[in-house]
């Protein structure tokens, strides 16, 4: 049992080191196979990030107020993850909309320089996050939104490896090479189960809407990736995570109760 727990803890540390910039012990037992197995803990990394961001928000809010704290929260999130998912969002936008053939799209996505489409996608995503999170904060729902969106968006993103082929046929030594294998059914079940616990805190109608809508987007993205590059890359997973996160925020704003403050009442009167 101790050996099993140590092995799983090593996988968790691998997942944290791969998906964040958080410090981890240097003595991690690494191999491509172990990194592939660590993908099952992607939602757990989301839980960790949500906890750190929630603590940051609660600490800074009394000093700065809502909007400045939300702005710093987004910056802190980028620092924690190294903007790995935003990088995937930008590269996918550049490749899918800037290339004509599969080969050209993959070449553009591999280019370290950002183009017009990627810049526009990043600006839209970051502005949307600020607006949506500010709205959720105004209604006292921001912490719940983080607890739902961070694990769920990551679990759904990594699930694409189950049903799509890795688009880069020849290994290019990218970070996602080690993840480019389907998961065992029991591992996939654990992945999805660990993504949704916070959704259970929602009213039933809201929970159903979030899960169904997120699954619809997941399958829409699957076919979109298939259409453009006949598979997926690590950038596609980043794109999927970002769009899922934004969708969840939007759905929570729509479904959760609103806080009517005195200023709003005065305006209506």
Curated annotation (Swiss-Prot):
Catalytic activity annotation: alpha-ribazole + adenosylcob(III)inamide-GDP = adenosylcob(III)alamin + GMP + H(+); alpha-ribazole 5'-phosphate + adenosylcob(III)inamide-GDP = adenosylcob(III)alamin 5'-phosphate + GMP + H(+)
Sequence similarity: Belongs to the CobS family.
GO molecular-function term, one example from the UniProt record: cobalamin 5'-phosphate synthase activity
UniProtKB keywords: Cell inner membrane, Cell membrane, Cobalamin biosynthesis, Magnesium, Membrane, Transferase, Transmembrane, Transmembrane helix
Organism: Pseudoalteromonas atlantica (strain T6c / ATCC BAA-1087)
Any single biological process term in GO: cobalamin biosynthetic process
Protein known as: Adenosylcobinamide-GDP ribazoletransferase
Function of the protein: Joins adenosylcobinamide-GDP and alpha-ribazole to generate adenosylcobalamin (Ado-cobalamin). Also synthesizes adenosylcobalamin 5'-phosphate from adenosylcobinamide-GDP and alpha-ribazole 5'-phosphate.
Cofactor(s) named in the record: Mg(2+)
Pathway membership, UniProt: Cofactor biosynthesis; adenosylcobalamin biosynthesis; adenosylcobalamin from cob(II)yrinate a,c-diamide: step 7/7
Gene responsible for this protein: cobS
Top EC category: transferase
